[in-house]
Amino acid sequence: MAYESIPLTEEIHIDKLYTVHYFEYRSDFYYAGERHNFWEFQCVDKGSAKVQTDDDVYVLNRGQVIFHQPNEFHNLTAVGQTAPNIAVVSFECCSPCMDFFKKRILTLSDTERNLIGMIIAEAVSY
């Protein structure tokens, strides 16, 4: 029996991880902001947070994630009475299809949220 292979294409290749964190912030938390030459995403696991970028201000709720492209200013402020829990992952990626994520807020499914949880759990084990 002859086997036929299927070539795989790698659309997104993450070259380096810089941070993988899970923060449990206070309800009055404020971070003045930063900019750096790599990608970052912030995913709200509980509560709500306001994120200011170079161009806009967004309010993210549970299950939403925002991507920050390299050199984009971003800060973070807790919103509401519930202290927010936020996963922050920063990484280097030069794949052209990352353009899709620029200035993008996505609402994650439970499966996607669980995958981020597994990334956090693995990072904590190191």
Predicted feature locations:
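Residues at the C-termini of beta-strands that transition into short coil/loop
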Residues: 24, 90-92, 109
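Short, glycine/charged-enriched secondary-structure capping and boundary segments
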Residues: 57, 82-83, 102-104
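Conserved beta-strand positions that form and line the central face of beta-propeller blades
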Residues: 59, 75, 105
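Loop/turn positions that initiate beta-strands
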Residues: 63-64
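Ligand-binding loop in jelly-roll beta-barrel domains
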Residues: 71-99
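DNA-recognition element of transcription regulators
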Residues: 67
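Generic protein-terminus/edge-of-domain signal
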Residues: 1-59, 72, 80, 116, ...
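Amphipathic alpha-helical segments enriched in hydrophobic/aromatic residues interleaved with Lys/Arg
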Residues: 98-126
